């Protein structure tokens, strides 16, 4: 099952905690991320964690080698605009959700979004539907 992983979940991967183990398990599956997630991940590690750039590059390269990484696209952006209105999402969260849905992921793992929310793309009988799950919630 393809699963999209949000930045706020991946950040725990660099921690020495039980949550890091959960992220390792998610990455061992058919994990999908987007370039947006890579950018946000690098930004948080540099700005909030004060991690050295070579270490950030190693972690990002590992993600690139481990996950299916989606490029940003106009279609994703346009879909995100619709999802913003439908689900009251920020532009950044809507782009994450759009990327996950357009890549046929069944689940989007996120700590910040509404756990259990079922998201459907616009259009008649859209096959592109996914559920948002918090992987740290028991």
Ranges and model annotations:
Residues 8, 42, 112-114:
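Anionic group-transfer/hydrolysis microenvironments
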């Amino acid at each position: 099952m393809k699963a999209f992983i949000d930045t706020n979940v991946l950040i725990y991967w660099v921690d020495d905690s039980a949550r890091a183990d959960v992220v390792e398990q998610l990455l061992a599956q058919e994990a999908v991320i987007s370039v947006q997630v890579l950018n946000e991940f690098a930004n948080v590690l540099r700005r909030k964690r004060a991690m050295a750039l070579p270490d950030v590059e190693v972690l990002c390269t590992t993600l690139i080698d481990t996950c299916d990484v989606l490029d940003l696209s106009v279609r994703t952006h346009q879909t995100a605009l619709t999802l913003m209105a439908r689900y009251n999402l920020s532009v950044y969260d809507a782009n994450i959700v759009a990327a996950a849905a357009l890549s046929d992921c069944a689940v989007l793992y996120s700590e910040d979004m509404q756990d259990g929310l079922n998201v459907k793309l616009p259009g008649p009988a859209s096959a592109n539907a996914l559920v948002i799950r918090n992987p740290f919630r028991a």
